[in-house]
């Protein structure tokens, strides 16, 4: 995956794969508690590349149905802005339809245009047979792949992680993981817990949990521990900031706006 794609996907994906010492597997768990999100939730993220505002990304959650099954429909949109748009135009659309109780995806759509590089894919998930049916709309090709239990797509993973956050109190350096299927490949998504931190944001001081999402080895990143993610330590579990060190500079992603949260957004006053 190129740097161009990451400028838009980082706040949605927040990392991929590797290992650590302690590990909590989330792949076979079904949430029994109240979900930390609901239909109507909306986020806007601002992505900075150095001193420039490189792009914006939005996430919106609505109610829908797939084959008569009630689902939540997450719509993601990313675009370059300002000076960055003159050099490199990005228009990315992502949709996922996932079970509103089990938080597993049934249908995923990726329709992107990044400086002339285009891709238009649909993935239908059959979790009973552990299969993903991938349709390339540009090439009119269909392929089927074996997937792991409860495999997530790029978008549903964002909500799955929030819903499946470990019940027990995490210790520093402990990790948890889920299974993912993206484009034509299976991955393992892992995050290491680094502790809590009071983060200064545009909204005020916010108590956050600090994580290290593990990403695939690529030439863009200096090393595999180059990404840091902050998630609000409250009932919403919102990714509020992400930093990624690159070979040439760094990317910073900040939560810019939000609405329709499940729980109060907590600000620290001392």
Report the location of each language-model feature.
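Bacterial N-terminal signal peptides that target proteins for export
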Residues: 1-9
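Hydrophobic h-region of N-terminal signal peptides that target proteins for export
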Residues: 13-20
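Acidic, serine/threonine-rich low-complexity disordered tracts
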Residues: 24-127, 166-270
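Hydrophobic, well-structured mid-protein blocks that either form specific transmembrane helices
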Residues: 121-165
């Amino acid at each position: 995956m190129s740097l161009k794609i990451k400028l838009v996907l980082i706040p949605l994906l927040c990392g991929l794969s590797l290992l650590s010492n302690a590990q909590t597997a989330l792949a076979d768990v079904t949430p029994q508690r109240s979900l930390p999100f609901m239909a109507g939730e909306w986020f806007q993220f601002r992505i900075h590349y150095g001193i420039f505002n490189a792009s914006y990304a939005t996430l919106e959650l609505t109610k829908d149905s797939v084959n008569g099954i009630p689902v939540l429909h997450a719509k993601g949109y990313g675009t370059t802005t300002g000076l960055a748009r003159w050099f490199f135009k990005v228009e990315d659309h992502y949709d996922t339809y996932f079970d509103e109780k089990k938080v597993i995806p049934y249908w995923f759509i990726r329709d992107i245009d990044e400086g002339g590089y285009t891709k238009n894919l649909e993935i239908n998930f059959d979790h009973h047979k552990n299969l993903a049916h991938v349709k390339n709309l540009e090439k009119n090709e269909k392929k089927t792949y074996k997937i792991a239990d409860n495999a997530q797509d790029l978008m549903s993973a964002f909500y799955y992680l929030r819903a499946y956050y470990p019940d027990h109190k995490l210790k520093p350096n402990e990790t948890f993981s889920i299974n993912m299927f993206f484009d034509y490949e299976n991955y393992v998504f892992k995050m290491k817990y680094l502790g809590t931190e009071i983060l200064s944001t545009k909204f005020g001081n916010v108590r956050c949990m600090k994580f290290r999402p593990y990403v695939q080895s690529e030439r863009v990143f200096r090393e595999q521990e180059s990404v840091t993610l902050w998630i609000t330590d409250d009932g919403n579990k919102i990714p509020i900031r992400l930093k990624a060190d690159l070979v040439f500079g760094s990317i910073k992603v900040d939560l810019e706006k939000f609405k329709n949260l499940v729980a109060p957004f907590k600000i620290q006053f001392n």
